[in-house]
Amino acid sequence: MVRAVSLGDRIKLGMAIPQTFADTPVDMMVVRRVSQRAEELGFESLWTSEGTFSIRPNLEPVGLLNYVAGLTSTIRLGVSVLIFPLHSPVRLAKAFASLDQASNGRAIMGIGLGEKSAPYG
């Protein structure tokens, strides 16, 4: 059984949202249960990542966070990290501004250059 742990202001714990489902269809009920339970247990944040070139298909991170924003009310929502060279800066800014509005200011944006250099030539 999982129990909530209070660590005060010393440590803030976050967890990853399920984004990949090996050899099975995407199960949004799993995403729902994990997200809501993490909030109930007092986790500070939920995280997605962008794995555009991964072997397994995964859910688009900002769209997934918008879904989770509608299921939760206090937990922060972040991407660790978006592969910046693959995005239009204006569209990315708008997507995150929309997520931040939809979540009442809970969005956390992480950007980086990406995973490995091979996909970029």
Walk through the language-model features, giving the residues of each.
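N-terminal beta1-alpha1-beta2 module of alpha/beta enzyme domains
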Residues: 1-71, 76
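Catalytic metal-binding/acid-base residues of hydrolase active sites
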Residues: 52, 82, 114-116
